[in-house]
UniProtKB/Swiss-Prot annotation:
This is NADH-ubiquinone oxidoreductase chain 6. It comes from the Eukaryota. Keywords: Electron transport, Membrane, Mitochondrion, NAD, Respiratory chain, Translocase, Transmembrane, Transmembrane helix, Transport, Ubiquinone. Belongs to the complex I subunit 6 family. It is a multi-pass membrane protein. The lineage of its organism: Eukaryota, Metazoa, Ecdysozoa, Nematoda, Chromadorea. Core subunit of the mitochondrial membrane respiratory chain NADH dehydrogenase (Complex I) that is believed to belong to the minimal assembly required for catalysis. Complex I functions in the transfer of electrons from NADH to the respiratory chain. The immediate electron acceptor for the enzyme is believed to be ubiquinone. GO terms for cellular component: mitochondrial membrane.
Length: 144
């Protein structure tokens, strides 16, 4: 069941990468978050999945505020979507980890979650990079 949620999360994130409309792309990113929460909550700490959920949803709503008012969208075909889908299915497939030594809050700072931190950071950086590229350099950030 965990692998089904993982496959659905990866598929919805790939669809958000392919989709050009910022509203639909944010919608599919929210779906990918909802499908990845059972996978993350199967680890040691349940509070960590809620923490990721709050941070990710606040970022999605910031993306909606900045990008939904922009009307010039440059259509670019994405040929890397199938490669990214296969790479994420092969490399990031979930395994249920059972640790009993890191049950405290201090386990948050150890090397267990560094992979998850780096993966989420890379996904968000790629999304922001390609979203600003697809918007035809019309200004994804506020001008001073």
């Amino acid at each position: 069941m965990v692998k089904v949620f993982f496959v659905l999360a990866v598929l919805s994130s790939i669809i958000s990468y392919i989709n050009i409309d910022p509203m639909k792309s944010s919608f599919f990113l929210i779906f990918s978050l909802l499908f990845s929460m059972p996978v993350i909550s199967m680890s040691m700490h349940i509070w960590f999945s809620y923490f990721i959920c709050l941070l990710f949803l606040s970022g999605i709503f910031v993306i909606l505020v900045y990008f939904s008012s922009l009307s010039k969208i440059n259509v670019v075909k994405s040929y890397m979507a199938v490669f990214l889908l296969l790479l994420s299915m092969l490399y990031f497939s979930p395994t249920v980890l059972t640790y009993s030594s890191y049950l405290g809050l201090s386990g948050f700072y150890y090397s267990i979650y560094w992979f998850i931190f780096c993966f989420i950071l890379v996904c968000l950086l790629f999304f922001m990079n390609f979203s600003s590229y697809f918007l035809n350099f019309s200004g994804a950030l506020r001008k001073v």
